[in-house]
Curated annotation (Swiss-Prot):
Binding-site residues, Ca(2+): 759, 761, 763, 765, 770
Protein's organism: Rattus norvegicus
Protein name: Alpha-actinin-1
Region Interaction with DDN, residue ranges: 274-733
GO biological process: actin cytoskeleton organization; actin filament bundle assembly; actin filament network formation; actin filament organization; focal adhesion assembly; muscle cell development; platelet formation; platelet morphogenesis
Location(s) in or outside the cell: Cytoplasm, Cytoskeleton; Cytoplasm, Myofibril, Sarcomere, Z line; Cell membrane; Cell junction
This protein's GO CC annotations: actin filament; brush border; cell junction; cell projection; cell-cell junction; cortical actin cytoskeleton; cytoplasm; cytoskeleton
């Protein structure tokens, strides 16, 4: 432990040897402690009207030391010695040290003699002990004390500030932002924290120290330059300075707490006063509303009409629904506020609230009772009055409804009975009108009761002195007069309808006879017109001859048809006589048919006109069919020659391609002669095309004189040209293969014989099984075992690379020539490259350009891969992989 430490402060004191070493190693700390401790002492001594200048000199006599302890403790010490001798000074210092010890601080190695002798280290240690005991030890924050408590307080206060991170009492304060943050947290008006910069510690420190000295009564205990110029400021100096801030702000906190307590008491009192004012106003408003409402509810003046009484009832319902509920809520809230106010006053030891006279809760309840009593009587009166008017209005409404129904029923009835629609009606319409009139008479009888009821209700309303009786009487009289008139018109109309019915029944029988005979005759004429105008489509002479015969048969029926026409017109003329004789107004037409005599005559004339037109059309079509028949015969004669000729040539070419007569050159010469003869036949094809064009223009679609169509001829001709060209090409390729591979004519004939032998369908190709049998016949050992199947699959991939499933004769020749001839191999090419390379495993570009033509040398250089062997040189190329790639044994 430090020689001036105590047991109570062992958690924040350094060991003595560390204290000594610190003072010796860092004189800057001693300077900081001198200045800080001196300023701290003077901040208390000035209260006694004195101060110190030199801390180790001014405390030597013990007088100012005792005075300092009295100021900071508030207690009186023993009377000091006033002598100037050393013994007097030691006595005074001991009195001070004894007082410190009496406060529970156990001093170690601090003696009065060292203080009297001006020992700086001991003097600073003693002052630090005093600071710890009287300025820091009592600091407590959340169960932490002394140093930790002070540090926690600093961290709490500076937490919201950027660039401030208080972790200790030395380097955390070097930039000055910590001091500024403490001041701004408690007195934000003193410092504009937003303008401070972390990289300007001198300004920050001087700002904090100057503001603290000027406004917070905290003396300047350190120089900003000393803190900034020290790698680690003295912890005790910083703690002393910070503790001054703590005590300065803790006093302000106490004042704030006292002010808050006063504000709280005043707020409670103001709230109670506001509640009293609210109660008085609410009570006054509610009583005023009750006084205004009661006279309205006591008004019992009745209204003459139901509408007016219903409006009063609606107003009363609005009062119940809209106006009263808020007042009920106000009354309830008034009682709640009164009880709440009395409770708050009682809890806060205030006297009970006494409302103004007439505004007590009981006064309001009495007024409310009067309101509800008036309300109940008003509602009963309204309902009784409404029921009374309702009975009278019901009777009047019943009259109006019955009168309206009767008037609606009679509306248009007089006009209907006066109309003379029967004069232009048909018999069926007359019968319908009679049925309708009978129904009306039944309806008229049924309405007799309603008319009597209307008169009875009107009489009752007169007896009850209904206010609108004059209008009721006038309406009733009008209904009775109209009713008598309807009866007279009804009888008159019945007589007219029955007279007209008898006259029209005779005419109806004639109309029916006319309709029965006119309809089939009209259908016959329409069918005849359709047949005569029908657009016929024929393709043979036989068809046109059949149409001509049918037309002649139709013309033979025309005289009988004309007789039927005249008979039908006679019936219509008889009807016309009856109409003229009895002056019947025939506004309508024949109800049984829409066919008029004019229509019959018009259609008959049309039929007579269409007959010669049909004769001419049939004659022209007969001539056209004769011409078409000549075209058919001409085309058929040529097609029956050309078709077989093409088929014969196809067979001959196929036979030449598989026969083995003569050499390949002889076969090629023979085929070229065939090709020439085929080309010379082209004019006959063109002539046939011309005949086919004429047939198409004549719209001829079939030809019984030949089985060949132009499409068949075209396809056959194109196949013939393609076949001769392909066959010539195959023979030319066989000649090239023979010459390139050195195959003799005998070998070629043998290959052809083998191929033809197994080409049993003469298709010119071999299937896989046919090809396999052919290879076996030529001596290839291809069995059905896995090895044989693999070998055959390899051969098929050579002869059928596109996997078409067939082997042509050319592919067969190529395969057989490779199998029998001496061909180049990859090994031979590699051996040649090795010679050019001077027996090396690689070759260079210069060697290739020297030995090969330029284009072939560049081709090899572009495609050869770089050589990667151990004997490689720059620019070496791999001719071995290139050689195998040429024969498909690897990739280029």
């Amino acid at each position: 432990m430090d020689h001036y430490d105590s047991q109570q402060t062992n958690d924040y004191m350094q060991p003595e040897e560390d204290w000594d070493r610190d003072l010796l190693l860092d004189p800057a700390w001693e300077k900081q402690q001198r200045k800080t401790f001196t300023a701290w002492c003077n901040s208390h001594l000035r209260k006694a009207g004195t101060q110190i200048e030199n801390i180790e000199e001014d405390f030597r006599d013990g007088l100012k030391l005792m005075l300092l302890l009295e100021v900071i403790s508030g207690e009186r010490l023993a009377k000091p010695e006033r002598g100037k001798m050393r013994v007097h000074k030691i006595s005074n210092v001991n009195k001070a040290l004894d007082f410190i010890a009496s406060k529970g601080v156990k001093l170690v190695s601090i003696g009065a003699e060292e203080i009297v002798d001006g020992n700086v280290k001991m003097t600073l240690g003693m002052i630090w002990t005093i600071i710890l005991r009287f300025a820091i030890q009592d600091i407590s924050v959340e169960e932490t004390s002394a140093k930790e408590g002070l540090l926690l307080w600093c961290q709490r206060k500076t937490a919201p500030y950027k660039n401030v991170n208080i972790q200790n009492f030395h380097i955390s304060w070097k930039d000055g932002l910590g001091f500024c943050a403490l001041i701004h947290r408690h007195r934000p008006e003193l410092i504009d924290y937003g303008k401070l910069r972390k990289d300007d510690p001198l300004t920050n420190l001087n700002t904090a120290f100057d503001v603290a000295e000027r406004y917070l009564d905290i003396p300047k205990m350190l120089d900003a330059e000393d803190i900034v110029g020290t790698a680690r400021p003295d912890e005790k100096a910083i703690m002393t300075y910070v503790s001054s801030f703590y005590h300065a702000f803790s006093g302000a906190q106490k004042a704030e707490t006292a002010a808050n307590r006063i504000c709280k008491v005043l707020a409670v009192n103001q709230e109670n006063e506001q509640l009293m004012e609210d109660y008085e106003k609410l009570a006054s408003d509610l009583l005023e509303w009750i006084r205004r409402t009661i006279p309205w509810l006591e008004n019992r003046v009745p209204e003459n009409t139901m509408q007016a009484m219903q409006q009063k009832l609606e107003d009363f319902r609005d009062y119940r629904r809209l106006h009263k509920p808020p007042k009920v809520q106000e009354k309830c809230q008034l009682e709640i506020n009164f009880n709440t106010l009395q409770t708050k006053l009682r809890l806060s030891n205030r006297p009970a609230f006494m409302p103004s006279e007439g505004r007590m809760v009981s006064d309001i309840n009495n007024a409310w009772g009067c309101l509800e009593q008036a309300e109940k009587g008003y509602e009963e009166w309204l309902l009784n009055e409404i029921r009374r008017l309702e009975r009278l209005d019901h009777l009047a409404e019943k009259f109006r409804q019955k009168a309206s129904i009767h008037e609606a029923w009679t509306d248009g009835k007089e006009a209907m009975l006066r109309q003379k629609d029967y004069e232009t009606a048909t018999l069926s319409e007359i019968k319908a009108l009679l049925k309708k009139h009978e129904a009306f008479e039944s309806d008229l009888a049924a309405h007799q009761d309603r008319v009597e009821q209307i008169a009875a209700i009107a009489q009752e309303l007169n007896e009850l002195d209904y206010y609108d009786s004059p209008s009721v009487n006038a309406r009733c009289q009008k209904i009775c007069d109209q009713w008598d008139n309807l009866g007279a018109l009804t009888q008159k109309r019945r007589e007219a309808l029955e007279r007209t019915e008898k006259l029209l029944e005779t005419i109806d029988q004639l109309y029916l006879e006319y309709a029965k005979r006119a309809a089939p005759f009209n259908n016959w004429m329409e069918g005849a017109m359709e047949d005569l105008q029908d657009t016929f489509i024929v393709h043979t002479i036989e068809e046109i001859q059949g149409l001509t015969t049918a037309h002649e048969q139709f013309k033979a029926t025309l005289p009988d048809a004309d007789k039927e026409r005249l008979a039908i017109l006679g019936i219509h003329n008889e009807v016309s006589k009856i109409v003229q004789t009895y002056h019947v107004n025939m506004a309508g037409t024949n109800p049984y048919t829409t066919i008029t005599p004019q229509e019959i005559n018009g259609k008959w004339d049309h039929v007579r006109q269409l007959v010669p037109r049909r004769d001419q059309a049939l004659t022209e079509e007969h001539s056209r069919q004769q011409h078409n028949e000549r075209l058919r015969k001409q085309f058929g004669a040529q097609a029956n020659v050309i078709g077989p000729w093409i088929q014969t040539k196809m067979e001959e070419i196929g036979r030449i391609s598989i026969e083995m007569h003569g050499t390949l050159e002889d076969q090629l010469s023979h085929l070229r002669q065939y090709e020439k003869s085929i080309v010379n036949y082209k004019p006959k094809i063109d002539q046939l095309e011309g005949d086919h064009q004429l047939i198409q223009e004549a719209l001829i679609f079939d030809n019984k004189h030949t089985n060949y169509t132009m499409e068949h001829i075209r396809v056959g001709w194109e196949q013939l040209l393609t076949t001769i060209a392909r066959t010539i090409n195959e023979v030319e390729n066989q000649i090239l293969t023979r010459d390139a591979k050195g195959i003799s004519q005998e070998q070629m004939n043998e290959f052809r014989a083998s191929f033809n032998h197994f080409d049993r369908d003469h298709s010119g190709t071999l299937g896989p099984e046919e090809f396999k049998a052919c290879l076996i016949s030529l001596g290839y050992d291809i069995g059905n075992d896995p090895q044989g199947e693999a070998e055959f699959a390899r051969i098929m991939s050579i002869v059928d690379p596109n996997r078409l499933g067939v082997v042509t004769f050319q592919a067969f020749i190529d395969f057989m020539s490779r199998e029998t001839a001496d061909t180049d191999t990859a090994d031979q090419v590699m051996a040649s490259f090795k010679i050019l390379a001077g027996d090396k495993n690689y070759i260079t570009g210069d060697e290739l350009r020297r030995e090969l033509p330029p284009d072939q040398a560049e081709y090899c250089i572009a495609r050869m891969a770089p050589y990667a062997g151990p004997d490689s040189v720059p620019g070496a190329l791999d001719y071995m992989s290139f050689s195998t790639a040429l024969y498909g044994e690897s990739d280029l």
